[in-house]
A protein has these predicted regions:
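Low-complexity, intrinsically disordered extramembrane tails and loops of integral membrane proteins
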Residues: 1-8
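N-terminal membrane topogenic signal
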Residues: 8-22
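Amphipathic, cytosolic membrane-interfacial segments at TM-TM junctions
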Residues: 90-99, 166-168
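Membrane-interfacial catalytic/cofactor-binding modules of polytopic membrane enzymes
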Residues: 131-139
Length: 191
């Protein structure tokens, strides 16, 4: 089942997921808020001048790299690759649809956790304390955070909150994948 299915049973199942995925997103947000500050620590790069984006990935190894880079990128790349199969094959394998669906359902809550945690522990303190290290630093961090919004959008497509029909849902799914890839690459370039 994916956004390509048009049966009323599929629409009902998609809508039925809205509440559980919403609860999962709220729980992820609470966890992101309550986690100890993962933006500070020691790492092999101590003393080097770098953006906060790269600094975040360098401290608390390997956990920050896994939480803030590996998990979101694996989910997004899975979505991108399965999206190509779904768009270009007239009858894609069921496992591709299922993989895309599960990655789409998980991506939103993961990014809610990441966004809440980084807004609380990085963006607000850096902004209020004047801690930004120049324009590249701001661009890297903010585009990374903005890249989370399309992944949340994909989850909303998967639960039926966005997309009036299968074609519209497919369109939004593809748009969100593309927007994520652009924003994530801008973050990496400036990071």
């Amino acid at each position: 089942m994916s956004t390509l299915d048009t049966t009323s049973a599929t629409t009902h199942r998609r809508s039925a997921l809205l509440a559980p995925v919403g609860v999962l997103a709220v729980v992820a947000g609470v966890i992101g808020w309550m986690l100890p500050d993962r933006t500070v620590g020691t790492g092999a790069m101590d003393g080097m001048s770098m953006t906060h984006y790269m600094g975040l990935l360098a401290v608390n190894q390997p956990w920050n790299l896994i939480l803030f880079m590996a998990i979101p990128v694996i989910l997004a790349e899975t979505l991108a690759i399965t999206e190509l199969v779904l768009l270009f094959r007239s009858d894609p394998p069921t496992w591709v649809r299922s993989l895309s669906r599960w990655a789409g359902l998980i991506a939103g809550p993961v990014m809610v956790l990441v966004l809440v945690h980084l807004l609380k522990n990085a963006v607000v303190p850096l902004t209020s304390g004047g801690g930004w290290r120049g324009a590249a630093d701001v661009i890297a961090v903010l585009t990374y955070l903005l890249a989370g919004l399309p992944l949340i959008g994909i989850t909303l497509v998967e639960v039926g909150a966005i997309g009036t029909d299968a074609r519209d849902a497919r369109k939004w799914h593809a748009i969100f994948v593309g927007v994520f890839l652009v924003l994530a690459h801008v973050a990496m370039i400036f990071g």
